[in-house]
Amino acid sequence: SAIKGRVPFINFFDGFRTSHEIQKIAIWDYDDLKEMCDMDAVAAFRNHCLNPERPAMRGSHENGDTFFQHREACNGYYDALPEIVEEYMGKVNAKLGTDYKLFNYYGAPDAERVIIAMGSICDVAEEVIDYMNAHGEKVGLVKVRLYRPFRADRLLEAIPATCKKIAVLDRTKEPGALGEPLYLDVVTA
């Protein structure tokens, strides 16, 4: 997705779990990885990188009159990125039998209360949701898989139409802010 979309990615994990757990992992064969890789996009990426044979100036100082023009020029890349990520999630799903989406819903199909979260809290929330639904509650969880760029339409598609209340669990605390980043995105959506 990063190479085809021409936008850098940050993959983040919950540090405590990563440093305190032992888990088995499945490693893909190189042939499987090759199927996932768009070699035309890789070639375009390599042709665009810095090269002494094709000198170019990047990262130079800009004044305000040109900075915002360049800043706005990259919007098209970010706007196209969710569809590219969905395309690759589809390829991974087909290969591994998973069901990754930008926003995955878990819980009662007629949930009245829904949690929206990302990260390891989702595993704990699933256990609680199973318990509560088994005892007559109607609750669910939306797991955020791609946080930025945030696709409000995909979030709304993931929330059951029966939902009356939403709780956003955010791992960030920004003192003095009106709300945390994920919460503000959900409210805006």
What is each stretch, according to the model?
Residues P8-N104:
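Conformationally flexible catalytic loops at phosphate/diphosphate-handling active centers
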Residues S1-K4, E86-A189:
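Thiamine diphosphate
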Residues R6-V7, E137:
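Residue-level recognition of short, well-ordered coil/turn positions
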